[in-house]
A protein has these predicted regions:
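Core SAM-dependent methyltransferase catalytic element
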Residues: 279-302
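A short glycine-rich, Lys/Arg-flanked "PGG" loop and its adjoining helix->strand segment in the class I
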Residues: 201-213
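Conserved alpha-helix/loop element of class I SAM-dependent methyltransferases that forms part
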Residues: 72, 76, 86-107, 121
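N-terminal auxiliary segments of SAM/dcSAM-dependent transferases
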Residues: 11-68
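Class I SAM-dependent methyltransferase SAM/SAH-binding core
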Residues: 107-178
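A short acidic, Gly/Pro-enriched loop at the edge of an enzyme's catalytic core
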Residues: 176-188
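A short SAM/SAH-binding and catalytic strip from SAM-dependent methyltransferases
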Residues: 186-200, 223
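C-terminal alpha-helical "lid/dimerization" subdomain adjacent to the S-adenosyl-L-methionine
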Residues: 220, 224-279, 285
């Protein structure tokens, strides 16, 4: 497995060579590609059946199967991410937090937050940024990890070295029906989770609802590679290596096969931009990481 220092160095080199791609709602003209992306976004919203990897299943069946899958992998979830990304997911999450720039007093909800990777980084970085910038707040920084799977939340609570002085709370809840009042949070995130939900449009609407005016939504997710040669190499690694590694290291071939398939079925970067715009987010943008192996999407509630 890649060590933290070498991983971060590799990640930063990759990020430095890949320009961010941004699309801001209402700016400039709309191209044919944008029209096509909007059409695919609308189609994705209105289809009755949904994808479980490459299978078409009913929405009820998908939610049940995803819940069972993550219950089975909860104790090895971080290993699952390490295998699928060669450990680089940790660097991508660090970069996401750099993009968020947490400050003291801000309130975060991490939707489908699993074992709390983003919440822990958010709380820690808010303190660091406050000291560095001389920013203080009478309100305490808070991060809520909301996940539908109690096994994932339990794995997060049991993580070694977890210490946030009560700033992190753990809430069982469905991303499609968040158990929170409207306009509660400054930042909403979902990291490597949205491709597993049944109705992405409902999740996006819920994220929009619970954000305060001026709040920001960030989505970090595996995406679509924009380099043909790299795409072929990535497909080979994904379909021929990841399931085998899942079997060897976690004793679970099927979960890792689903992981690969779910990535391929996730909307491409521009389609997801249109889905965010359809929800109501403004100044929507995305940044490719490693030529689109992953991407960070950002939208504002204005």
């Amino acid at each position: 497995m890649i060590g933290s220092r070498s991983c971060r160095a590799l990640c930063l080199r990759g990020l430095g060579s890949i320009p961010a791609r941004r699309y801001c709602a209402g700016a400039g003209t709309v191209s044919n590609n944008d029209d096509a992306a909007k059409s695919r976004a609308q189609k994705a919203v209105h289809e009755h059946n949904t994808n479980f990897g490459f299978e078409k299943v009913s929405p009820e069946h998908k939610q049940e199967r995803v819940k069972d899958l993550f219950t089975s992998v909860a104790s090895k979830y971080d290993l699952m991410n390490d295998i699928s990304s060669l450990g680089i997911h940790r660097c991508w999450k660090d970069h996401l937090i750099e993009r968020i720039r947490p400050l003291p007093g801000q309130q975060l909800i991490d939707i489908a937050g699993g074992t709390g990777d983003i919440a822990m980084r958010f709380v820690r970085q808010a303190k660091i940024n406050g000291l560095r910038l001389g920013v203080r707040s009478e309100r305490e920084t808070k991060a809520v990890v909301c996940d539908i799977n109690p096994a994932m939340l339990a794995a997060g609570r049991a993580r070694p070295g977890l210490s946030s002085d009560g700033q992190i709370s753990w809430q069982e809840g469905n991303a499609e029906e968040l158990p929170f009042d409207a306009e509660q949070f400054d930042v909403a995130t979902i990291s490597f989770g949205i491709r597993n939900v049944t109705h992405m449009d409902r999740v996006l609407r819920e994220a929009y609802r619970v954000l305060k005016p001026g709040g920001r939504f960030f989505c970090l997710e595996f995406s679509h590679v924009d380099n043909p040669l790299l795409a072929r190499m990535y497909d080979l690694y994904s379909f021929q290596v990841i399931p085998v590694m899942g079997q060897v290291f976690a004793g679970d071939w099927k979960s890792y096969q689903y992981l690969v398939e779910s990535i391929r079925k996730f909307p491409n970067q521009q389609v997801f931009v249109e889905m965010l715009r359809e929800t109501g987010f403004k100044c929507v943008s995305y940044e490719n990481l490693f030529n689109g192996i992953a991407a960070i999407h950002l939208g504002f509630k204005l």
